[in-house]
């Protein structure tokens, strides 16, 4: 007799008539007048629970089985048989049911067997993975992460672990969380009366990273093809469905690559992971299509077969100015495109994923390569129908004199980036990369509208519970 996941039973990987044990939690219990009870038992290995048929001849039937409620944990042993009921092919004829944990008060159990609002579930984030929705999100999140690792491994990339604590501001935006062990009640001061960070743990001002890119570039300039994948932090006071203070970023970096090279890489990567999630998480994706967003599966299938459009920022602005549509945010050359502009381009004009390239330098970061016109940089955004920007990237500035001039323009002290500048002093190469916000990717795949519901424990302004 072997312990098996529920998924193996339901998906036919266990022979009929074999004795198995499944371990999980009760989703529902139904009692029949014929002297049977039906337990729906789930263990998170797949979307559906397995049905266990319990005969009233079991010694603990009256004392325990009939008291089981949603959320109780059980170990069920029995024979796998073809199911007589609708909805699943196999069930378990139980020979024993061991109760390992009771729900203290079924009437006050926060995850009682009913539908809960998504807002309520955020208040009980420690229990919400027990729901159909968040359980499905968690499995899709896992599958997407595994597919990303697999894709880059197959493409010859190395995964590099970049630091979460940094002294550099990659984006130059200044919206960073400070890391300090100084006594807030007794801060050391220098001669100017400012906080003396020389006395701090790292001997300088330190922050949680907003991006692993700068560190990633150092390894790309030695290993040629690398990617980073981990948490990043933004101290943006944004309470929107698209923002988190802590989120995951995937950032590949490729030596000897130009902007077009990484645009092609981004397209291949997205199509690869979308194909993987449709194949490997068919049951969860069916749930999203039925209960969350009826277009969830079709959207990914269209994306996989679509030819990506490409357009220069300047031409994109012209398209938007001449489309005859009234936008909430004005459009003119030099403005950063808003979500409504991006979605118009992808959904209404091109009706396909689109790569917008060569943005005005004044709205982009210091490290992006200055184009020959002196006004634009080799930057790109990948826009997807249904969400807008899903990837942002650029060719990096490999010319030291141009990089220094850009830093000066933006008021950055080049000495703070001495190690980053060294890459341009010792065997510089053209190189390019992009960033993918992992939670936005999951939201796009599942149709879940708010990124707070696709990360286990969302960190947002005034919320760091759990």
Curated annotation (Swiss-Prot):
Domain of life (superkingdom): Bacteria
Gene Ontology cellular component list: cytoplasm
Recorded GO MF terms: asparagine-tRNA ligase activity; ATP binding; nucleic acid binding
EC number: 6.1.1.22
Enzyme class, UniProt record, top EC level: ligase
Catalytic activity: tRNA(Asn) + L-asparagine + ATP = L-asparaginyl-tRNA(Asn) + AMP + diphosphate + H(+)
CDD domains xrefs: AsxRS_core, EcAsnRS_like_N
HAMAP family tied to this protein: Asn_tRNA_synth
Description of how the protein assembles with itself and partners: Homodimer.
Protein's name in the database: Asparagine--tRNA ligase
Lineage, top ranks: Bacteria, Pseudomonadati, Pseudomonadota, Gammaproteobacteria, Enterobacterales
């Amino acid at each position: 007799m072997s312990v098996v996941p529920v998924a193996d039973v339901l998906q036919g990987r266990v022979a009929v008539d074999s004795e198995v044990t499944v371990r999980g939690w009760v989703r529902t219990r139904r009692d029949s007048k014929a002297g049977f009870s039906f337990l729906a038992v789930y263990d998170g290995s797949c979307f559906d629970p397995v049905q266990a048929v319990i005969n009233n001849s079991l010694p603990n039937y009256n004392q325990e089985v009939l008291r089981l409620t949603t959320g109780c944990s059980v170990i069920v042993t029995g024979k796998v048989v073809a199911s007589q009921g609708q909805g699943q092919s196999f069930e378990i004829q139980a020979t024993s049911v061991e109760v390992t944990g009771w729900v203290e008060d079924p009437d006050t159990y926060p995850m009682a067997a009913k539908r809960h609002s998504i807002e309520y579930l955020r208040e009980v984030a420690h229990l919400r993975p027990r729901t159909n929705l968040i359980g499905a999100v968690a499995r899709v999140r896992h599958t997407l992460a595994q597919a990303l690792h697999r894709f880059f491994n197959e493409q010859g990339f190395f995964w590099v672990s970049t630091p979460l604590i940094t002294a550099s501001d990659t984006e130059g935006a200044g919206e960073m969380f400070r890391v300090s062990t100084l006594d807030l009640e007794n801060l050391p001061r220098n001669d100017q009366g400012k906080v003396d960070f020389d006395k701090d743990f790292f001997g300088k001002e330190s922050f949680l990273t907003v991006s692993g890119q700068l560190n990633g570039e150092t390894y790309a300039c030695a290993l040629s093809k690398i990617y980073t994948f981990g948490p990043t932090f933004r101290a943006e006071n944004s309470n929107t469905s698209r923002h988190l203070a802590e989120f995951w970023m995937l950032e590949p970096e490729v030596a000897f690559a130009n902007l077009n090279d990484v645009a092609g890489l981004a397209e291949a990567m997205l199509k690869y992971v979308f194909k993987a999630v449709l194949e490997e998480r068919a049951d969860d994706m069916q749930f999203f299509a039925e209960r969350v967003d009826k277009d969830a599966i079709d959207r990914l299938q269209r994306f996989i077969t679509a030819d990506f459009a490409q357009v220069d920022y300047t031409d994109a602005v012209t398209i938007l100015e001449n489309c005859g549509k009234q936008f909430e945010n004005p459009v003119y050359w030099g403005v950063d495109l808003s979500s409504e502009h991006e979605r118009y381009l992808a959904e209404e004009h091109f009706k396909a994923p689109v790569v917008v390239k060569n943005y005005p330098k004044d709205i982009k970061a210091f490290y992006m390569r200055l184009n020959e016109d002196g006004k634009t940089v080799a930057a790109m955004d990948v826009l997807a129908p249904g969400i807008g920007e899903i990837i942002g990237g650029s060719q990096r500035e490999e010319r030291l004199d141009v990089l220094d001039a850009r830093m000066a323009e933006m008021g950055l002290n080049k000495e703070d980036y001495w190690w980053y500048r060294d890459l341009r002093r010792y065997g510089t190469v053209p190189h390019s990369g992009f960033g993918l916000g992992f939670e936005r990717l999951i939201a796009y795949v599942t149709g879940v509208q708010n990124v707070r519901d696709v990360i286990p424990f969302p960190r947002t302004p005034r919320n760091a519970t759990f």
